[in-house]
Amino acid sequence: MDSVHPGGLGGTYGGNPVATAAALAVFEAVEEDGLLEKARRIEQVIREHFEQNADDRIAEVRGRGAMMAIEFVDPATGEPDATLTATVAAAVRAAGVILLTCGTYGNVVRFLPPLTIGEDLLKEGLSEVTKALQSA
């Protein structure tokens, strides 16, 4: 390609040098701060927590990196349990931890902690989920 034909490049922000520099800075920060490794560790901590605190109302712990989720079901039927999910989420919010509920049936709690979260704080938040589940 020797040159771009008229109308061949579009978009107000396409190839913007400032946006390109910002993207490069983000990639450098991800590498320098070890954020990929931190995401992997967050996943490991969440999975280990729910393995150690198994509950038959948790159908699945899923996700990758820092974006994880747990799915709640009625253990007798295997049906999604949106009521339990809402109860757990409300109790955890009352304890000061922000959780998002989601899923087609409203029976999933999603975790998306910042990559910079300290492990102690992450474990404290997960403990609140376990306490809420045990009292539900």
Where are the language model's segments positioned?
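Conserved N-terminal phosphate-binding loop of PLP-dependent enzymes in the Aspartate aminotransferase
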Residues: 1-136
